[in-house]
Amino acid sequence: MFTNWRIFAVNRQKTFSVHIHTTCYCKIKANLKRSKTQVPLTRSYSSPPGIVGNEVKSLHSIINPPVAKIRNIGIMAHIDAGKTTTTERILYYSGYTRSLGDVDDGDTVTDFMAQERERGITIQSAAVTLDWKGYRVNLIDTPGHVDFTLEVERCLRVLDGAVAVFDASAGVEAQTLTVWRQADKHKIPRICFLNKMDKTGASFNYAVESIREKLKAKPLILQLPIGEARTFQGVVDVVNREKLIWNSDSDDGKDFERKPLSEASDPTLLKETVEARNSLIEQVADLDDEFADLVLGEFSEDFDLVPAEKLQAAIHRVTLAQAAVPVLCGSALKNKGVQPLLDAVTTYLPSPEEREHGFLQWYKGDLCALAFKVLHDKQRGPLVFLRIYSGTLTPQSAVHNVNRNCTERMSRLLLPFADQHVEIPSLTAGNIALTVGLKQTATGDTIVSSKSSALAAARRAGKGERKPGRISEAESVLLAGVEIPEPVFFCTIEPPSAAKQPDLDHALEHLQREDPSLKVKLDPDSGQTVLCGMGELHIEIIHDRIKREYGLETYLGPLQVAYRETILNSVRATDTLDRVLGDKRHFARAELEVRPAEEPCGVATIEYADSVGEDMLQAPREDIENAIHSACLQGPLLGSPIQDVAVTLHSLMIHPGTSTTMVTACISRCVQKALKKADKQVLEPLMSLEVTVSREYLSPVLADLAQRRGNIQEIQTRQDNKVVLGFVPLAEIMGYSTVLRTLTSGSATFALELSTYQAMSPQDQRTLLSQRSGLARVL
């Protein structure tokens, strides 16, 4: 059966972050690579993988291992903490590559996009399937840039566990906090890997303390480093009281020695380990009642007698309950500590059956899967990543998309191995699959075996009754999709000629399916296409992909900030629409009120006055509310979306025979009339900012931020550096990378994340409106 497997290659894409290293590592790496012999990025698959590029070993495990032996995990961290390097080492030690990929050399397996290999960053999360000591591990390497936060959100939605990678010299950094919060939201158990223990300034104790203080987590120290920075040579296994020393003569780190600690040879290290183990036992006993009963009953006199397997089982339960996080350490770049990390993944992180999914009881074993990522391949069309929660997927079978109420036929079923894919005959619950043939499916869609299966699940859930505005009964069994953040930047994009506009539209359509955080709009005034994205890097990567993958040399307009608008007072308005079309009269009159919402809200909240009965609402409520929301997409000042607004419909008169289109047009005009009469306010995106800078450059950095309307909240000390925390308007921080590099001689880094939208001062608002010349733009 295995001889019939086939390998395919696809191009892929990702999402981003505004964390910028002012040392311009991407340019340094690009220059270094220019001096080397260039290796083509694309691989030939006329022969089995392993013949060209990174050699890949065929999967030897069974196609569908027991669910208890599956681990769906993600690698998450701040940029440059070593996520991709750690992943490459995992692939190598598990036997799926025969050479070590390196980010600096641009030959990694999971960073397979041209932009990733040139920049030395991860943009798009690459899924990799591998085996380790009888376990199937589905591994996803995620980006650390804030511009690509959606990519992290996508993979966390379908994971059962995660590995958080930290730079041991920096501890918890800005993006670490972001991805940690995302993991908390999805209740994902995780373990921590303190990477770069060989780096100058690495401090195990500092990193552990930052996890405790900044993440408010309870670290369980499972390993101790043997040496730090240049003296780092291995780790101590606290649970088993053993030391692991990597052979200095081994270049690839495969050879290491595991020895029990003894009083004779390691008295000091043994003492530290015993103390750490006793402390670990006490910590776990406080968090796990079963283990506490065992320790107090059988081993109260001597903790040394507590069996390692009992302690490991308790740590597994504590990790699953998210009461604490196991902490390990090593250096992926120096090939030390990665094999024990893989052991910890299989020992402490949960299997799919250990995660609670309440909706599974509705399906009774029928197929239920979530589409969490869509890619586009020029030969095979859309490629959809699915997490299978229940049932079995088979190729050449029809499946039902609950969100889009359509049935599609899946032609092929693949196991993902970065840009290499292995075709398989079936895949069961707990696995991550890649499918070919689902042309309508988008990110966040729920996939079931048939429409009748979805309706049966809805009835079991007790929510099968039709409700006003409900599209279908099956909506009650939709899985929670992936939250799409609002873009903060936009710019126009033009093709090289009008004849190429259809080609550009085609490219943008594909890119939007792959990356839902990319929004494409049409400016009604100029007719230009507008790109809306998560940051400067996001827009830059999209522009680059259009050129590389679709052969279009497009032109970008100036990058602009995506503002919002709101109102400051309550206003009533009335609008009448009276038209004769053919021999039919269409008449509608609406009266409504707009006012500031009591609570912040991204979209308008809609209410109906008591005088508006169901008999007056001859048009469906859904159409009425869509008209109100549509009217709030373009504010009267800048054409920006309106937020923090409440709308109350007071009356609606409709002549018999009036079309729904005329009614909604009347309501939409009435909302716009009310918004124009109200006192208006522009809201600007406010970013949370973290700047890491050496002491000597702190003063000029603070002075520069003050000129940018920055609000400094705190200045922390991190090793020999200062960390400036604060808020700054996004409009003031554009191009900050170049300025900071100049101020600090390229030694500082900074990270940005959208915090909220704040009201602009009257003077700043007047300046902005003057710059925009009063012309509205579609965001």
From Swiss-Prot:
Reaction(s) catalysed by this chain's protein: GTP + H2O = GDP + phosphate + H(+)
List the CDD domains hit by this protein, alphabetically.
Answer: EF-G, EFG_III, EFG_mtEFG_C, mtEFG2_II_like, mtEFG2_like_IV
UniProt GO BP = mitochondrial translation; ribosome disassembly
A GO MF label:
GTPase activity
Please give one Pfam family short name.
EFG_III
The UniProt record gives the binding positions of GTP as 77-84, 141-145, 195-198
Domain spans labelled tr-type G: 68-353
Q: Which GO terms describe its cellular component?
A: mitochondrion
Gene3D superfamilies from the entry?
A: 3.30.230.10, 3.30.70.240, Elongation Factor G (Translational Gtpase), domain 3, P-loop containing nucleotide triphosphate hydrolases, Translation factors
Which InterPro entries does the record cross-reference, listed alphabetically?
EF-G-like_DII, EFG2, EFG_II, EFG_III, EFG_III/V, EFG_V, EFG_V-like, G_TR_CS
Identify the enzyme class. Answer: hydrolase
Keyword annotations for this protein, in alphabetical order, are: GTP-binding, Hydrolase, Mitochondrion, Nucleotide-binding, Protein biosynthesis
The protein's Enzyme Commission number: 3.6.5.-
Q: Where in the cell is it found?
A: Mitochondrion
| Major subcellular site | mitochondrion
Q: Which family does it belong to?
A: Belongs to the TRAFAC class translation factor GTPase superfamily. Classic translation factor GTPase family. EF-G/EF-2 subfamily.
Per the entry, what this protein does is: Mitochondrial GTPase that mediates the disassembly of ribosomes from messenger RNA at the termination of mitochondrial protein biosynthesis. Acts in collaboration with MRRF. GTP hydrolysis follows the ribosome disassembly and probably occurs on the ribosome large subunit. Not involved in the GTP-dependent ribosomal translocation step during translation elongation.
HAMAP family tied to this protein: mEF_G_2 (MF_03059)
Beyond the main fields, what else does the record say? This protein may be expected to contain an N-terminal transit peptide but none has been predicted.
User: Which PANTHER family does UniProt cross-reference here?
Assistant: RIBOSOME-RELEASING FACTOR 2, MITOCHONDRIAL, TRANSLATION ELONGATION FACTOR G-RELATED
Q: What is this protein called?
A: Ribosome-releasing factor 2, mitochondrial
Gene source species:
Rattus norvegicus (Rat)
